Structures are given as C-alpha cells and as structure tokens.
C-alpha cells in the first residue's frame, strides 16, 4: 500500500500550489483534491451537477459521499507510491469550525502524515485580496486567520492521535514557495 499524505491549510495559504509543485518531484505520487473526488462520486450517483450543490444534500448523504471518497482515495494509494490528498483540516462556518476529516474519513484514509501549510496571517490576507477576482474568498482579519490556523493545528493533532499519523508544519511565505516545496518533498521522502 502506498503512503497517504494529507495536505491542508487555510484558504489562501497556498496548500494547493505547494502540493501541485511537490508532486512534480515525487515519482509515483499523485495529487488528489478531496472535494473533486466527492464531486465525482455525487455526479456518478446523479445527485449533483456542481460542487456547491453537495452542501445542499442531506447531511447523511454528504457523510456517505465523504466515506466513499475516502475509500476511493485509499484504493488509489494502493496502486501508487503514494497519494497527496489536498483537503480542509477544518472548515470555518457561521456556526463554528467543522472538522474536515471526521472519524469515518480517517478510518478509510489512514494517513501516514498530515502536513499543515501555514503562513503569516497578513500574507494570507493579501493573497486572498489578490485572488478575489478569480475566487470567492472570505475576508477574515489577521486574528481570525490566526485562530483558524490554531484550530487546524489542534484538529491535526487530534486526527494524528486517532490514526498514528505524524503532523508536519510547513511555512509557505511570500516569495519562498521553493522552500516550502522542498520541505514538503523531504517530508514525503522521509517516510
């Protein structure tokens, strides 16, 4: 069975950019977006046409799709050197923080390492402003972004306690993408 690496970070931190670049240097690894796999399954079942519609499905159906996506990703990992799963550690909602990797997902995925990609809250705020023309982003203040990153750390350690995974924190600062990518690649190669 190949390795399962979960890569995560708050919106705007650059987790997808780091993982997309890292996988280019990791032979036999594939980069998978968890939400894309969920959408694929929901479409196959004729439940949705677009990603935003998943949120409107009954909670039980969403959980089922989450579980099926985790199972599919774990199966993909069996056929590769490893899978890098790009997903949310926690999701900030009006009602509070939602775990991005509930127990039924962790049981299927069994990650080897959870990589938290972080940056300074001010850097993330500026990235979100730049991205706002292409993507719909939340405009959190620096202290809210800092809180979200802390919540991600706490959730990641809880996930690690449940699965035996390690937790690695990688900083992705402005104009230093190569350093973050190098550290990510080194982390994966150390497994």
Swiss-Prot record:
Instruction: Please give the name of this protein.
Output: Adenylate kinase
Among InterPro entries, the record links this protein to:
Adenylate_kinase_AdkA, P-loop_NTPase
Similarity field: Belongs to the archaeal adenylate kinase family.
So what does this thing catalyse? AMP + ATP = 2 ADP
**Entry GO CC:** cytoplasm
Q: What is its main location?
A: cytoplasm
Q: Where in the cell is it found?
A: Cytoplasm
Give any GO molecular function from the UniProt entry: adenylate kinase activity
Residues where ATP binds: 9-17
Annotated EC: 2.7.4.3
Q: What class of enzyme is it?
A: transferase
Provenance organism: Methanopyrus kandleri (strain AV19 / DSM 6324 / JCM 9639 / NBRC 100938)
The cysteines joined by S-S bonds are none
Please provide the record's keywords in A-Z order.
ATP-binding, Cytoplasm, Kinase, Nucleotide-binding, Transferase
Q: Does the keyword Transport apply?
A: no
User: Keyword ATP-binding: yes or no?
Assistant: yes
Q: Which NCBIfam families match?
A: PRK04040.1
């Amino acid at each position: 069975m190949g390795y399962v690496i979960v890569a995560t970070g708050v919106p705007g931190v650059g987790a997808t950019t780091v993982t997309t670049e890292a996988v280019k240097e990791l032979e036999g690894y594939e980069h998978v977006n968890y939400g894309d796999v969920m959408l694929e399954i929901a479409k196959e079942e004729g439940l949705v046409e677009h990603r935003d519609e998943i949120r409107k499905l009954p909670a039980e159906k969403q959980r089922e799709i989450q579980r099926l996506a985790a199972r599919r990703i774990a199966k993909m990992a069996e056929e590769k050197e490893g899978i890098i799963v790009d997903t949310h550690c926690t999701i900030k909602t009006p009602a509070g923080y939602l775990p991005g990797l509930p127990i039924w997902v962790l049981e299927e995925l069994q990650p080897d390492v959870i990589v938290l990609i972080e940056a300074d809250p001010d850097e993330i705020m500026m990235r979100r402003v730049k991205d706002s023309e292409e993507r719909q982003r939340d405009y959190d203040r620096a202290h809210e972004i800092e809180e979200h990153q802390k919540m991600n750390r706490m959730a990641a350690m809880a996930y690690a306690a449940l699965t035996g995974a390690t937790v690695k924190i990688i900083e992705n600062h402005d104009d230093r993408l190569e350093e973050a990518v190098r550290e990510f690649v080194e982390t994966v190669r150390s497994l």
